[in-house]
């Protein structure tokens, strides 16, 4: 008789090697956001439902891994992927569809009772997307490989690009209301995007109590990032001069809401 516990043990043993980087929850979650999203995710309809494993990254809370297990390899995936309670792919995709309303989700379907017979399928369901996309191969990977593959995937690139377009459009409209010249708006948006690539700035910008101090920090960070990109000498000096208006334009450095709320 097929024993799903064997499948779970194999899966648990693999991911338990990475507990320095991840947290593993089994058939429940202490995260209120996750719990709320799964409140009607029962595979049989009605009520809460939970996958065998929910894995979250300690350094990247935007991504969840959900894993659904079946002992019988013939119960790996149904033709229409709508037999949620009976097939591992179907169930994993169901949970991913619910959790993708608040997270990017890597859904992993596992079937088989031995390492030799194990079947593994991976799907990436990005937040607010309508469907999941196959990704990776048919073997377990390390959690670092999962994270790096997700971050570098074409799907994630497209999501980030679209988010960036929305951000720059909204920011441009906001700056227009402060009567910032179009040429200066472009420079300011560029400076913000450059500065946000700097981890230290990204973590600390909200701590500035005065917009004047934030403006100084922004310009210094941009200069540091440009220098790190091997832009030096006269070229760096010219770029710093172009960005310097951020410190001197009173509509930016004096109006509290303008610069502070642009990130």
How would you name each of these model-derived features?
Residues 71-76, 161-180:
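Short amphipathic alpha-helical segments and their helix-coil junctions
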Residues 5-13, 159-166, 170, 184, ...:
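N-terminal amphipathic/basic helix or basic patch
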Residues 194, 200-263:
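Long recognition/docking surfaces used for binding and targeting
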Residues 53-63, 144-167:
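An acidic intrinsically disordered interaction segment
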Residues 1-104, 112-140:
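A short, conserved, highly charged catalytic patch centered on acidic carboxylates
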Residues 171-175, 183-202:
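Core catalytic lobe of class I
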Residues 76-82, 175-181, 201-209:
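Short, polar/flexible loop-turn hinges at active-site or ligand-entry regions and domain interfaces
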């Amino acid at each position: 008789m097929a024993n799903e516990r064997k499948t779970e043990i194999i899966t648990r043993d693999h991911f338990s090697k990475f507990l320095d980087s991840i947290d593993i929850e089994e058939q429940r979650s202490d995260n209120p956001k996750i719990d709320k999203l799964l409140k009607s995710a029962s595979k049989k309809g009605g009520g809460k439902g939970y996958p065998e494993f929910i894995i979250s990254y300690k350094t990247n809370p935007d991504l969840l891994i959900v894993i659904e297990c079946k002992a019988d390899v013939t119960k790996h995936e149904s033709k229409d992927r709508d037999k949620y309670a009976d097939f591992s792919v179907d169930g994993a995709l169901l949970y991913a569809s619910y959790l993708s309303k608040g997270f990017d989700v890597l859904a992993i379907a596992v079937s088989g009772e031995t390492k030799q017979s194990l079947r593994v399928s991976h799907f990436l369901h990005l937040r607010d997307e309508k469907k999941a996309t196959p990704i990776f191969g048919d073997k377990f990977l390390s959690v670092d490989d999962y994270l790096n593959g997700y971050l570098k995937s074409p799907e994630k690139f497209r999501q980030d690009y679209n988010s960036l377009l929305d951000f720059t459009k909204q920011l441009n409209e906001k700056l227009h209301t402060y009567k910032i010249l179009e040429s200066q708006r472009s420079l300011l948006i560029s400076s913000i995007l450059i500065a946000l690539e700097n981890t230290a700035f990204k973590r600390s910008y909200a701590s500035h109590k005065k917009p004047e101090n934030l403006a100084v920090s922004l310009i210094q960070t941009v200069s540091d990032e440009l220098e790190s990109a091997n832009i030096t000498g006269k070229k760096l000096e010219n770029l710093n001069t172009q960005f310097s208006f951020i410190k001197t334009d009173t509509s930016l450095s004096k109006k509290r809401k303008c610069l502070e709320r642009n990130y």
